[in-house]
Amino acid sequence: METWQEVTVHVHRDAQEAVSHVLIETGSQGVAIADSADYIGQKDRFGELYPDVEQSDMIAITAYYPSSTNLADVIATINEQLAELASFGLQVGQVTVDSQELAEEDWADNWKKYYEPARITHNLTIVPSWTDYDASAGEKVIKLDPGMAFGTGTHPTTKMSLFALEQVLRGGETVIDVGTGSGVLSIASSLLGAKTIYAYDLDDVAVRVAQENIDLNQGTDNIHVAAGDLLKGVSQEADVIVANILADILVLLTDDAYRLVKKEGYLILSGIISEKLDMVLEAAFSAGFFLETHMVQGEWNALVFKKTDDISGVIGG
């Protein structure tokens, strides 16, 4: 019987998506994220509130590697990457890394215990692909397989992106999703009525994972996924462009975004740690955008910009 190696990284929740990406890049065959915040105020599948749990800023990200993997090399790489993330200003907390061997049948189902349906916005609920879920009237369900996902949709940056999409989409729009990762923002855009969505990611693994998640959801044939370096080479105009990536990368796409966003269209930028906020604002204002909405959750910020000549109620430009 084949055995697997389990590596658990205890890290600040602000680093969830970045660390999940690192684990996939080092060869993990799946990741699971245990975050007490996911259960605060949530109900289980039987409609009962979860019992009170101690809230902490630290989460546990568990990755699974084949037995043939040199775990010492993997852990060394993980520690190097975590140090690099910290140098970019990302809060990683007091990191600890644990490991153990796991039988194959345990690996196949062990990580699933971490996931329950999560209501993210008024209309949007993220549901693990293996869970039977009865949606209420008006509730829109996004099915995800978090086993290979770049986050599960519960990170503050993703939540704020989903809130922003819910606010600006009215139906019939063209949306561009830059750095699509798990594809969750593209799927949400489709469910919220967008006509056509173009999803790009530089990472081939993300492109594949996004397509797999899109295929789990009905009515998402209007999402087109492709490898791409931000908005380079893109000529398709859009009513909405959304990007949930690191601030240092966001500032590189604002000029191209202004070129592609239609008049009266929106640019949604998330993944911005507070100390990088001014840098992103300056880049967007320099490109010609006006700020319409600023959302904050903890140390994270999301910004909704508009391309408009009517500057009443907006800032910057």
From Swiss-Prot:
Coiled coil: none
Positions bound to S-adenosyl-L-methionine: T158, G179, D201, N244
Record's subcellular location: Cytoplasm
EC numbers on record: 2.1.1.-
Function description: Methylates ribosomal protein L11.
Keyword S-adenosyl-L-methionine listed: yes
Catalytic activity field: L-lysyl-[protein] + 3 S-adenosyl-L-methionine = N(6),N(6),N(6)-trimethyl-L-lysyl-[protein] + 3 S-adenosyl-L-homocysteine + 3 H(+)
MF terms (GO), sorted A to Z: protein-lysine N-methyltransferase activity
One GO process term, biological-process aspect: methylation
Family in the record: Belongs to the methyltransferase superfamily. PrmA family.
Main localization (coarse): cytoplasm
This protein's record includes keyword Protein transport: no
Keywords noted in UniProt: Cytoplasm, Methyltransferase, S-adenosyl-L-methionine, Transferase
Gene Ontology annotations for the cellular component aspect, listed alphabetically: cytoplasm
Protein name: Ribosomal protein L11 methyltransferase
